């Protein structure tokens, strides 16, 4: 069965994870969730943009070591992050540099502005999201060969989760969405994450 990457990744963002992250950032829970969702979509479209670079997917995923702190804190079978500490602040930064190079700072600021969270929070949840996405792909290495096609197939849905300013930085039109704008705006953040947000 072909996985929906966003749905699979959102499974890991439980209320417990949000609560632990907010010990560092003191943001509104709903805005923090939205920021993570935007960041995950941004990382996925960053990968989409690298599809034509030979071996890029294999190389960036190989940067995730199985003995790394963040990787070991994920129970992939259960779809749970077991513990949240600040290791991602350092571990995720190198991934973002590979993915976005000189656009990294602009994307971080745009996440902050578009979502309504502090600049520091935006920087660090981008690190967190980069590690989550790459760790998921590291665990599911069989997806690497078909990742380009997966991202192409899911491109419009992913773009729906990304605000216009970030789309422009990534090189996409603001109108590259699959839903009518009013329908998309009316979607509840909590619905995006399903029941898992309320599970511990």
What are these regions (language model features)?
Residues 1-200:
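A structural "flexibility-hinge" signal
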